[in-house]
From Swiss-Prot:
Catalysed reactions, semicolon-separated: N-acetyl-L-glutamate 5-semialdehyde + phosphate + NADP(+) = N-acetyl-L-glutamyl 5-phosphate + NADPH + H(+)
Active site location: 142
Protein name: N-acetyl-gamma-glutamyl-phosphate reductase
Pfam families per the UniProt record, alphabetical: Semialdhyde_dh, Semialdhyde_dhC_1
């Protein structure tokens, strides 16, 4: 049995990792490291987690076999290299190691990093073999997951008649996507019965999406726009993807392409009916529905995920399972 520890365990993603790893049959949860919450019991912050473990400050320990890092952007850059050098299996949930371009990283994250600070991108539906061989994984972002899975078959599939001219994405996330820290704009009084856009055209997941789909922000091969929004739900991401094709395609043709593309992906469900956030909440599933296809080549695709699971902790454990030679569904039955 593998020993596992979490660095940054007191945030929402860290709490979900804790919950899932406590019941995972192939690992033993060893240490929970946190900075601002060090010294507090897990059950004090999260009564749902009936664990007697106490959050500890992290001081560079590397006794566990596997380390998850669920820290704010920028904080993993210095912590990951020593763990990798020590031969540990590492899965980082931040954006610190996702982008190959240091220019794009600095532009969108407002932080500098070295060109070597890149790890295998942990989206098993696209990079399964690379993940199996990897020792260090950069877990995808939540918005990026909902969008990439929603359009990947069109850009990376084997139907040569499909040529994408442009993609417009509007995605609404639950408030938990903004993290656990107290902010006035995220308070109940501000967010109840409310929805608002933010970082329009500037969100840090834009270059991640473009990179994964085989293009880039600086030299795009298709038009791409992204409007992220936050709404008055706790968890979930609901994405409406409007795709412009060079040539029209029937909805049934697109649906068949998607089902073939994801036939070996246990956590992607191509639905015949409209997706809803409540159908994926508290699960590791991504639900996709081909909602409409017009005569002028416009597709409307709708996806739904749980931002804390398929968009964070669940996908991270899915990656761990593959890296350790387990069935990727282990510990993720819902």
């Amino acid at each position: 049995m593998y020993s596992v520890s979490i660095i940054g365990a007191s945030g929402y993603s860290g709490a979900e990792l804790t919950r899932l790893l406590l019941r995972h049959p192939g690992v033993e949860l060893q240490e929970l490291y946190a900075f601002s919450q060090a010294g507090k019991a897990v059950s004090e912050l999260y009564p749902l987690l009936s664990s007697d473990k106490v959050y500890k400050p992290y001081g560079g320990e590397c006794e566990s076999d596997v380390y998850f890092l669920a820290l704010p952007h920028g904080e993993a850059l210095q912590l990951v290299p020593p763990l990798v050098k020590a031969g540990k299996t590492v899965i980082d949930l931040s954006g610190d190691f996702r982008l190959k371009s240091t220019v794009e990283h600095e532009q969108f994250y407002k932080q500098q990093k070295s060109p070597e600070a890149v790890m295998t991108y942990g989206m098993s539906e696209l990079f399964r073999e690379e993940i199996i061989k990897a020792k260090a994984i950069s877990n995808p972002g939540c918005f990026a997951t909902s969008i990439i899975l929603g359009v990947a078959p069109l850009l990376l599939g084997n139907d040569s008649s499909i040529n994408v001219r442009g993609i417009n994405c509007t995605s609404t996330s639950g408030i938990s996507g903004a993290g656990r820290s107290s902010k006035t704009e995220l308070s109940f009084s501000e967010m109840s019965e409310n929805i608002r856009a933010y970082k329009v055209g500037l969100h840090q997941h834009i270059p991640e999406i473009m990179q994964t789909l085989g293009t880039s922000v600086t030299t795009p091969s298709f038009d791409f726009t992204f409007t992220p929004m936050i709404g008055s739900l706790v968890r979930g991401i609901y994405s409406i993807l409007t795709v412009n094709l060079e040539n029209p395609a029937e909805a049934e043709q697109i649906k068949a392409l998607y089902k073939e593309f994801y036939k070996e992906a246990p956590f992607v469900r191509v639905r015949d009916t409209m997706t809803e956030v409540r159908h994926v909440a508290h699960t590791n599933f991504c639900d996709i529905h081909i909602a409409h296809a017009t005569a002028n080549g416009t597709l409307i695709i709708v996806t739904a995920i749980d931002n804390l699971l398929k968009g964070a902790a669940g996908q991270a454990i899915q990656n761990m399972n593959l890296m350790l030679g387990m069935n990727e569904k282990t510990g993720l039955s819902f």
